[in-house]
Design a protein with these regions (language model features):
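Hydrophobic beta-strand-centered segment that forms part of the acyl-chain substrate-binding groove
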Residues: 38-89, 104
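HotDog/MaoC-like acyl-thioester-processing domains
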Residues: 6, 68-73, 81-145
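Hot-dog-fold acyl-thioester-processing enzymes
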Residues: 1-59, 115-145
Length: 145
């Protein structure tokens, strides 16, 4: 897959007192993008529950580059930056763009897959592997060996 992009809906409730997007909304948008991608590739939250696995995040960071306001049209991309070959651990990146093409924010996160019964990190099942295999890779993607 070359690119995964979603248009975002900016709501009044997403604004802070300064009239721009509240910092925590960026993280919500990232989660929305990731779950949408996984669902569209056969790995819905209910399917994860059936498989008894779920993603866990170790670190999540947002770099704010341009102000985003209510009237802006905004898009979010999803890319895989790094991964183990079994996709048990990974680093993803979300790029948030204004309609003009201006990069507004970069959200980066490190995570893994957890067995939701044992509550331990695990190698994910084949369905997870299949979804990650088609996830767009960044230009500088590298395997974590």
């Amino acid at each position: 897959m070359k690119q995964y992009r979603k248009q975002l809906q900016i709501r009044w409730a997403d604004l802070d007192p300064n009239g721009h997007i509240r910092h925590s909304v960026y993280y919500d948008w990232g989660a929305y993008s990731r779950i949408a991608f996984l669902t569209e590739n056969g790995l819905s939250p209910s399917r994860m529950m059936e498989l008894q696995v779920g993603p866990v995040i170790f670190r999540e960071e947002c770099v704010f580059k341009k102000e985003i306001r209510l009237e802006d049209t905004l898009y979010i991309d999803l890319e895989l930056l790094q991964a183990r070959r079994d996709f048990s651990r990974w680093t993803m990146q979300h790029l948030l763009y204004k309609e003009s093409g201006t990069l507004a924010a970069v959200l980066t996160l490190n995570g893994a897959w957890m067995d939701t019964i044992k509550r331990k990190l695990t190698v994910p099942p084949e369905l997870v592997f299949d979804a990650y295999e088609v996830m767009p890779k960044s230009a500088d993607f590298e395997w974590m060996d």
